Amino acid sequence: MTDQSTHFPKFYVTGTSPCPYIEGNTEQKIFTELSPQPLAYDKAAILEHPNQNRSREEELHLSLTLVGFRRSQEIVYRPACDHCQECKSVRIPSKLFKISNSQKRISKKNNDISFEIKPNTATQEQFKLLEKYINSRHFEGGMMGISFSEYKDMVENSPISTIIIEYRDRDKKLIGVALTDKMKNA
């Protein structure tokens, strides 16, 4: 009999914790790592061809996003709450998207905002904006006190191919940053 345990990811379930979305509810998540251990029989090949291992991770990520998983660094997770199904993973087919009147108004109001797609390289300017955001919105969250080296690691050492999208106002001041996964179907 062949040991298949290294061929498939292992899934785990978190304990329950207060739901961040619905007061009085609890949440639970199912998760797995995107960086599984290399296959025992293929270790030399993976070390010789690391991009093929990244390809495996990207295929796993793609497959899991199709069934509602989200990514946070090297972990993919989705809600797995016993008594609630309110969290919905939303995928919008871009070819079918039709802009609403309110979205047109918002776009017109913000027509002075520009964006630029960049490689996944962390900068101090991005980090300062992240700190400002955390201090104003997530001061009790898990990212409070993140260091620049931790931010740099999050941005630059991803198991998935990523890009940075920077948003700037008319004075070229950085006002938004999106660390974005590059995916075959997106």
Task: Set out the residue ranges of the language-model regions.
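Short, compositionally biased low-complexity segments
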Residues: 6-27, 94-110
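A conserved beta-strand-loop-helix scaffold within acyl/acetyltransferase catalytic domains
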Residues: 72-84, 89-186
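A general structural-boundary detector
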Residues: 6, 51, 113-117
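Non-catalytic peripheral regions of nucleotide-handling enzymes
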Residues: 1-5
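Acyl-donor binding region in acyl/amide transferases
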Residues: 9, 14-18, 23-66, 70-72, ...
